[in-house]
Amino acid sequence: MEIPITIGRATLSDLEEIVAIEESCLSSEEIVSYEFLEESIRKIADTFLVARDENQLVGYVLGESQSLHPTWIEIRSFAIHPDHRGQGLGTLLLASLKQVAVEGGYEYLRLTCPDDLLSYFEMNGFV
């Protein structure tokens, strides 16, 4: 029996699991500080989404609106736990963030990524 993945807004109770995923996935240069993540949950929870497999947090995407470009959301951090990659969770999270952006009146999602991830994001509609 397959367990459905649920997508929801990040809460402060998710913070430790988010940090653990970051540390398991990202290099020290890419890791966002605990304080930034906590502040993001408090201030921009609408665009900070988490994926859960039952009670376990398995991935997240953090989007932040830009004051210079109020119709943009910039993806600041995005990670899927290594044990859950290749199952479409990243695509599901990105699609969910796109839906939140449309519902919020945003026109663009923006991100920067290493060259080796370009094809992944292109596959998910980024150009």
Q: Language-model segments: which ranges?
A:
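Conserved catalytic-core motifs of GNAT/GCN5-like acyltransferases
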Residues: 112, 122, 127
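Extreme N-terminal starter segment of soluble prokaryotic enzymes
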Residues: 4-6
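Acetyl-CoA-dependent GNAT
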Residues: 9-13, 20-76, 81, 94-96
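Conserved GNAT acetyl-CoA-binding A-motif
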Residues: 101-113
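Alpha-helical elements of the RecA-like P-loop NTPase motor core of helicases
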Residues: 16, 35, 119-122
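Conserved glycine-rich acetyl-CoA-binding loop
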Residues: 56, 81-92, 104, 116-119, ...
